């Protein structure tokens, strides 16, 4: 069945993520911000968390939301394609009627269509263990490179001691 998130106030971090898992989003135009503030909190998002934003946002909006953590108000969210409309409960019901969403699940394939649309997102959830292993190997590699860099600097300082004149 179609799902709609009615955002009548702030949706930060996990609340924003939960809203993105809905098929449609309608936001209060006068109150509330959407914000993925993990960048400011120093909390990295795991791949499955990132995937829903990657799947549903334009590449530029995805980059800005993830790397800058802006607070996005209603009209900006609509302009960026994050939400599908602005308004309150009346507008949500109007949106449902306009799009004829009530009967869309009647054929029994609505869920299948969504599974196909978001196959990579589902794959990210199913492959979370591999995602964690990949992240761990990347971080281990960074540690090795950092140690090698420190060693090269120490070697250079040892060899160049007393040679530099300023």
Question: What role is predicted for each listed range?
Answer:
Residues 6-11, 65-71:
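Glycine-rich beta-to-alpha transition loops that act as phosphate-gripper elements at the mouths
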